[in-house]
Amino acid sequence: MEVYLDNSATTRVFPEVAELMTKVMCEDYGNPSSMHRKGMEAEQYIRYAKETLAKLLKVSEKEILFTSGGTESDNMALIGCAMANMRRGKHLITTKIEHPAILQTMHYLETQGFRVTYLPVDKSGRIHLEDLQRSICPDTILVSIMFVNNEIGSLQPIAEVGALIKRMNPNILFHVDAVQGFGKFRIYPKKMNIDLMSVSSHKIHGPKGVGFLYVGEKVKMLPINYGGGQQRNMRSGTENVPGIAGMTLAAQMVYEKFDEDMDKLYELKEYFIKGIYKMEGMQVNGLIPEAVDYRSTAPHVVSVSVAGVRSEVLLHALEDKGIYISAGSACASNKPQTSETLKAIGLQKEFWDSTIRFSFSVFTTKEEIDYTLNVMYDMIPMLRKYTRRR
């Protein structure tokens, strides 16, 4: 049996999405900026995409900017807004557990003279609103907080954060990295006081290399690339029409059975975690065992620390059995360094190199979960014995 449980890294493309993209690439392949019929046919896909995504978010079509994915969207939001608003102030706020696309961009902005406050999180990976309130200064211009953490699945109180920011200073911009949240939660930027929001297609069964950035109509932001002036001069470059069409169809398909699929994912998550706790020396991160509330976390992510077994050893042992997981964020997995998220939640040092991530999708079945648990029941005691002998 082959079991893919690394859906926070990327998801399998819906077959219908692949079919549509093939049609766009082979038949409707015109440049959307061209004036002839082929160009106008391609442009229709972009118009339809903006209309569709705007309806899902309850925003205006002109507030959707297509990008190459989450990293570009994050960079565009942070650098573009920081540079455009620096006369009002040079203070930025984020958290200690953001995606590298946020943290590394913040580090870059620090070299450009900006001050950055990194908010701590509790053991469940959530910020405290009191810490945010204390951190906001007269020269704060932007706050960036992720919707769902990609490593442990912690869920931030985004609506409450947005309300707090706007109550303290309506001019502070609020950016949300929703790469792991879009398609798992119904997100309405205007209702939640979100000014900018990053989304990536390949986390919702769409193609890689495409995403979008929601930019509120009143947001002042500079472009970070220059060229032909596409997308109202905010993101130059010929639009990825097949990718945009595929992403839009994927989003539509995700929303068709939204509540049903999310209920299924939460049921699988609860079932899996109960199975994990039947083994000795196991710890699920981002949850408090005595007061488990699965709905206060993302439905698709489970971070597990396995006492006495290194994460890379377990990852490859499971791979040999056809089970594919992650030892952390795939976006930074090629770097042998300890996860900042695991440090921030206060995970014991002995677990830093013994933590793995399972992440589910609408394709995940209970049979796959049972197979994974049974393999782990047999495998982990043997790996621990081998580790002790060494």
For each predicted feature, which ranges?
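Pyridoxal 5′-phosphate
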Residues: M1-R390
